[in-house]
């Protein structure tokens, strides 16, 4: 009987020790995860002016900086903002509770759980218009960021390049108001401003939206997080895009710096082409 009790004690002790170690290694330091947050259907408010913006997936990254069990520190980057958060790893659920405090639209409470190479959970985002937070589901995958100047915008979507975030009212001949959206061209698939030396001859007749996309493609390759919704949503569709910085100036190559200067000159004077959808 004593031997049986001794065995049970040793088994329980070993399970406690090794079980804790396994949980401690679940979240690893210096690990990057990238994914999107999606507002859960029951939190939709169809009466809000920004309803479609609220429900559209938002890409962001979570970088686990340090794990000092049970404490964990991480950095969240998204929507053109970046901030550090601290949390506690819950041994039982293998979850981590983050309480971000900021005014950048990413604050609230995060409850996350490791599943293999993914992080899943939810985010109770602070709501400026209500005391009730907005619940968003989160799915993040483990990624490694590597700058690649050859990354190009995918031609998978062969339709028109449309900026739905900046509509403009036009008065027609019959005095009615028509909403139109600025459109780009397929030139954005052909110019790589990270590798090609741009000239005035190339840029002088281009549309403003095309110029902006070509310029921001440079920043996207370096992991820049866009605050402008047009480009945040546009580059979110690219598998290579990993937002992990809010300032990439120090990372730009000489070609990129020179091209950005020239692109900015033409963006300042270029015209947009608008179309009714």
Regions picked out by a protein language model, each given a short descriptive name:
Residues 1-25:
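Bacterial Sec-dependent N-terminal signal peptides
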Residues 21-63, 71-79, 83-172:
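Beta-sheet ligand-binding and adhesion/scaffold domains
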Residues 188-200, 243-246:
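Acidic/histidine-rich, surface-exposed loop or edge segments in extracytoplasmic proteins
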Residues 226, 233-277:
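Compact alpha-helical subdomains of small soluble proteins
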